[in-house]
Amino acid sequence: MVLSMEIRQLIVAYARSKGDICALAQVSRDFQVVAERFLYSTLDLSGTDATISVCNVLASQPRVAAYVEILTIAVRDEETAGEEELSPHLPEEYWRSMGAGLRSTHRLMRLTIQVDYIGHSHHAWVLDRCQFKLRTFHCDLAWDDHLVGFLNDQDELEDLYILDFPYPVDAEHPTSTEPQRPLSPPPPPVRRVVSPVPRAGSLPKLSILECPTTDAVSALVPGRPITRVKTCFATSDIETKRRELTALFVNLRLSARPLLSLDLGDSSYNTDCTLNFLRHCVSANRTMDNVRYLGTLALPVDGREVWILPSHCFFFAYLIIMF
């Protein structure tokens, strides 16, 4: 008796454990296809050894790799606390196997790489020569030419989360506060760090962006249909934050779609910052006309500022949540 595909899928779906599904995969070739698709369509890999093992399977068995649509790779400090003293870096085999596995997953749609581990920076080369077209990509890899080159090829990407973006260093705002000797020669000028950015026309479907600084917003928002932005100030200095805020709204105006959500993190939440933020929102009314969410705000509870707040909120006709 030959079971239909629908019945085989129901049997696999009601299996109690992955061990039972593995056993079903050995019953017949028909069950093998359904069971393997169920096992490998969504993979959540945590730990060095497990990641190496599964990625080696994907690299050596293209048939299995073709089932993978959602992949999460994570290694955290607490998982490797006992090994950290002996090896401060993840082994090269970890990165090689990850790269080989990723290059074999041609149907991948959602990828998350969270390697919260010392020495993880500058390993975005694992994304080189990958052929999949993602819808969602979350990573904490270092922002470099490899990561930017990968993003340049992601024509279907809609949701992007990055944890790293180089902080600019400007000669007009030196970080050193040490006094200079009167007769010492002036220090050489500090050159601004130029970060690689995706080329114009890339990421044509990007609509959700979560990034660590407003500088990343200026690199990724203009010309793209971004409707939801989550970012934060790069500094706690009030004057610098004002300049950042002005530049942020200039870049938000350059989005190809109306903004629906803006969440701006601040290391020092206070009412002055909130009111300044709302003033910028009001002055950028065309950009903010359709906004429904403004993140976490420190609202005034007494004084004259309480009466100023309604006049600002009046302009947000569609605002749903504001705490």
Question: PLM features: residue spans?
Answer:
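Leucine-rich repeat
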Residues: 1-323
